[in-house]
Structures are given as structure tokens and as C-alpha cells.
């Protein structure tokens, strides 16, 4: 009964601007048709969608489930079963990508940001989890934590105040990670390249083969593997040094101090 009260939609009072957004989001979630024969999967989908939109800094299913009232001490298995057989992440990302095309004219570049991220894990048998430096520790007391590593590709809108919309999420598990699928073991740069290839293929499939794809990344992309990537109508911009590894140094160039700039 308390969960039903949380999702109850009412007309906004007109005094607070945030109530209009919450009302429309709740109305959209409650009226979205799903091909389910039982009410439990439909309510589970509503709970997760509401938590994903309303709460911030929630990345895992367990974190989303804990936002529901009453707060469960043990996460029910229905939240995990909801994605085991019926959820295709690639199809979901491509569906979200198609919805961003209406905001990008064909004569403008489709801009994405590529960056690596880690998701903290505490389980002992989670595939791909490995020990990484813990950024929450103090500088004078460095420690480790278990986490999964991913590469996120986010679409950037022309509005300077807009946040990026994640349109692709690719695992980049360490080669030494236990219980991981061999196809998920890759470096971060390999994840960047695979993400660019997927998004370029989506643009081509949408009839936008001539549209330019602009990729923006940080200094981790300063590698020859990304600098020599040949994709049609694709441009990559990353932060580089004066002696960037994107460039092939001339043969016979003296090394050490006093080396000529290239």
C-alpha cells in the first residue's frame, strides 16, 4: 500500500516548478504499456524506472531497490530476475540512441563523450570485479576496493547547461578479473574503440552515413591505437602532450633532454 502511495499521480499545485516535472514523470511511468501478463513484473519495472529518474547517484539494481519504501534490508530476487532473460542491453541502448537523433540535425556533428568509470562491488563472486585504488580514502592512507570497470559513451547536446545522456555502456574488465566473460576482458582504449564502432554503425543504419561523429575524451585516449583509428566521418579530440603518442616520432631523433618538438 505504501508503494502505491509513492506512485500515486496528482495534479501539480502550481506553486512549485518541480511538481510539474514529477507529475509528468509519474504519469509517463504509470501509463507506459508493457507486454506483461502478471502485475508483479509491471510494478517492478515501475519501481526501478521511478528510482532511476528521481534519485541521483544510483548505479546498481540494489541501490535502486533500496529507494523504495519501506526500505528493504534484503533485496528481493524479483529485481534481479526482471533482467535475467527479458532484457537486451544492446537493443535498449540502440533504442535510446534513436530517440536522440531528432535533436541533432544531419548537417551537425553527433557529439559523444567517452570516459571510463568504476562501479564498487562487495560480493566475492561478482564477474569482472577486481581490486582497484579506492578514491574515497585519504591521500595519506591509500587503500583498495573491489569494483567493476566500464566505458560510458554519452551523447552531448548543444545546450551548454545540458548533461550528457548515456547511450552505450561497455564492460572493460581487467584480464586478471575472475569469473568474467572472456569477451568482456579488454583495456579502456579497446572499449573506446568498440564504442565508437558501435555508434558509427548505428548512425549508418539510421541513414546518416555522411553525418560526422565527434568524440571527446580525456588524456587516456592519447594512444596510437585511437589516433590511427580509421572510421569514416569520425573525428576524435583528446587532451594530448607536446610529444603526443598519436604521432610517429621521426627516426633517428635524439632522446632525452633537448629533443626537438614534433
Where are these regions (language model features)?
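Gly/serine-rich nucleotide phosphate-binding loop at the start of the catalytic core
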Residues: 2-84
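An internal, acidic/charged active-site-proximal segment
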Residues: 178-262
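Short glycine/proline-enriched coil/turn segments at helix->beta-strand junctions
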Residues: 70, 107, 231-234
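Conserved aromatic-histidine-acidic binding/catalytic patches
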Residues: 49-56, 141, 180, 184-187
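Short, conserved catalytic/metal-binding motifs centered on acidic residues
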Residues: 64, 109-122, 153, 213-222, ...
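Active-site-proximal, Lys/Arg-enriched surface segment
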Residues: 51, 82-167, 171-173
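Short, charged/polar micro-motifs that form catalytic or ligand-binding hotspots
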Residues: 50-54, 69, 140-143, 215-220
Amino acid at each position: 500500500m505504501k508503494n502505491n502511495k509513492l506512485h500515486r499521480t496528482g495534479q501539480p499545485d502550481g506553486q512549485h516548478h518541480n511538481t510539474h516535472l514529477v507529475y509528468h514523470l509519474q504519469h509517463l511511468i504509470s501509463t507506459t504499456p508493457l507486454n506483461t501478463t502478471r502485475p508483479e513484473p509491471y510494478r517492478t519495472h515501475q519501481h526501478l524506472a521511478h528510482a532511476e529518474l528521481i534519485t541521483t547517484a544510483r548505479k546498481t539494481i540494489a541501490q535502486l531497490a533500496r529507494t523504495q519504501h519501506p526500505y528493504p534490508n534484503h533485496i528481493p530476487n524479483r529485481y534481479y530476475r526482471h533482467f535475467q532473460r527479458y532484457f537486451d542491453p544492446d537493443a535498449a541502448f540502440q533504442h535510446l540512441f534513436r530517440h536522440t537523433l531528432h535533436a541533432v540535425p544531419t548537417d551537425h556533428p553527433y557529439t559523444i563523450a567517452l570516459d571510463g568509470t568504476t562501479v564498487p562491488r562487495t560480493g566475492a563472486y561478482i564477474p569482472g570485479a577486481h581490486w582497484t585504488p579506492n578514491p574515497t580514502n585519504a591521500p595519506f592512507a591509500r587503500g583498495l576496493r573491489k569494483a567493476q570497470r566500464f566505458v560510458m559513451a554519452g551523447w552531448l547536446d548543444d545546450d551548454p547547461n545540458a548533461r550528457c545522456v548515456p547511450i552505450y555502456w561497455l564492460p572493460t574488465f581487467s584480464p586478471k578479473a575472475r569469473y568474467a566473460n572472456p569477451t568482456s576482458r579488454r583495456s579502456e582504449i579497446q572499449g573506446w574503440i568498440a564504442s565508437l564502432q558501435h555508434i558509427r554503425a548505428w548512425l549508418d543504419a539510421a541513414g546518416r552515413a555522411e553525418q560526422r561523429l565527434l568524440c571527446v575524451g580525456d588524456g587516456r585516449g592519447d594512444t596510437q591505437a585511437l589516433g590511427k583509428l580509421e572510421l569514416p566521418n569520425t573525428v576524435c579530440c583528446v587532451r594530448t602532450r607536446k610529444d603526443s603518442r598519436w604521432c610517429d616520432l621521426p627516426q633517428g631523433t635524439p632522446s632525452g633532454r633537448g629533443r626537438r618538438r614534433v
